[in-house]
Amino acid sequence: MSQTNYIPSTPNKSTPPSELSSTPIDENDIGLLVSLNQEISSNIHVKIKIEENITIGRSKTCNIVVPELIVSGKHCIITRADAIENGNTNYGLLMIQDQSTNGTFINGKLIGKGKSRLLKNGDKLCLGKSTKEIDISFLYKSNYSNQLLLSSSTNNLNNSGTAQYIWERKDIKDDILKDYDFIKELGSGNFSVVYEGVNKNTGKRVAIKHLNLSKINTHTPKFKSQLNREIEILKFINHENVVEIYDIFYTKDQQLFFILELANGGELYNKIGFNEPLLNENQSKFIFKQILNAVSYLHSKGIAHRDLKPENILFDSYGDDYLKIKITDFGLARFIHEGELAKTLCGSPLYVAPEVILSLHHKNKYGTNSSSSSQSPTKDINSVGYGKSCDAWSLGAILYIVLCGTPPFDDDDDEEMSTPQLFEKIVSGNYRVEKLEKSLISSSAADLVKGLLTVDPDKRLTVEQALNHPWITEINNNSNNNNNNINNNSSNINIIKKSPLKTVNTNNNNNNCKLSSPIKNSSKLKRNLSNEPLNNNISNNNNTQTSFTGSLLNQLQLNEGELLKKRKTFLSNNDQKENINPVINNPFLKSSQ
């Protein structure tokens, strides 16, 4: 900024916050620094582009000149903290760097020379320490304040004269607010809320996951000791395909906060089509190998994810051609009581391994303290090995959905299926193998899916075996380099927006590809929940297990015929998926994060 503005010397006369609403705002500005002294002739219009800065000080070389002795030659520097990149919304956030001798203050707190602090809507900026003789202070009014987490009350100013934010009423602790500001809520689940935040000192965008453990765990010393061990393990996770954990806060009242790397390219969930996939086989392979590498790394650290699903697989950046992924929410299930896990199954059952369902059934039948190995149908639900095999199953379900565009355990003839019926299909391995075989994918890809969707965990492919599967090892070597743009892997790999048939890489002369459309399963899923064995006409190379839904209904507190939350699907009224007609009912479940 080349223009220099002079602000005259003024006595101390403050303007009440209630009178600030009449101050005109230029919509082309980022915001206004509204003078809190009536003798200052004009406010400071913050017109600033990305990577530009505004200097405020006594020197004539500054953009904003304040000729007061308390103000240093170059007192502070204002930069944008909300650069618009990768599709991010502009939130009107500013970063203030203190360059002064007498101090720059935000809401009465000294920034410190050479240090920076975030300035958000409603904050008070003061040049030098306020005294009775002089007070050079401003109230920042962002033109984008309606996009921040302001409270819904008519008076957005608290007793200190600064904006009141939603998290101030949500038990978000001072330890977190010392270093981070919360911008907006990204999503919520049964036990957690995820916010987009920003580091006050650096302006770096982060994701903040808030887990309220007081609702789901005990206060025993044993649990707290285990929690500390788990936190220490998670802090040392470092992999290019795993969302980085910057910091973890744990409060005395069992509030857990994860400060996470922000992957803002959207979820894998948003690139799954309806009945026909949006990703071709080479793109699916490129993505799935990254997922396998990430899960393999976590397993090597003794961490089982336990909640793998497309919603927990994020793209690093926006764009159809940028397919680098990062998985998130790993290890969080280790902080959740097993009893609560049973409740979550009803909200996100599509990726649950058979042994998880059987384990819950076993504990309901024999009791949680049962140690009879002869009666137990599964491994210990809390063991690491158990979690690893469950992850492999979930990966198989994810790969099936990505390749086929529909979930493996679903009914072609009905949009609605009860949770017990879905569980019955899962534990019997009764997935739609004909859909997989008739889809336009290679036999090698289908073989990998079948190996992962094997009911017996001892016969199921491990993640390491999946990494060594021919479908993965034959991946183009170019996909292993550091340039993650998928266009470098093949000249013919483009995301197919909508097509009746899957398009594959034309450079791959695979004789196993079939051009026939998928055949619908003519057998309608039975609606009554009996104890009869399932129909075994379809063979998936799995060990079929008998029905147990009668007692499982009691374990999960479900009634016979109860539907999967009315099949909430991938498309809600307020949530439109990428490139998919919103009037179509997608047969997936929209599970909570």
Curated annotation (Swiss-Prot):
Residues 54-111 form the FHA domain. Keywords: ATP-binding, Kinase, Nucleotide-binding, Serine/threonine-protein kinase, Transferase. One of its GO terms (biological process) is DNA damage response. It comes from Dictyostelium discoideum. Its EC number is 2.7.11.1. The active site is at D307 (proton acceptor). Pfam families: FHA, Pkinase. It catalyses: L-seryl-[protein] + ATP = O-phospho-L-seryl-[protein] + ADP + H(+); L-threonyl-[protein] + ATP = O-phospho-L-threonyl-[protein] + ADP + H(+). The keyword Kinase applies. This is Probable serine/threonine-protein kinase fhkA. Coiled coil: none annotated. Residues 180-472 form the Protein kinase domain. One of its GO terms (molecular function) is protein serine kinase activity. Gene3D superfamilies: 2.60.200.20, Transferase(Phosphotransferase) domain 1. InterPro entries: FHA_dom, Kinase-like_dom_sf, Prot_kinase_dom, Protein_kinase_ATP_BS, Ser/Thr_kinase_AS, SMAD_FHA_dom_sf. It is an enzyme of class 2 (transferase).
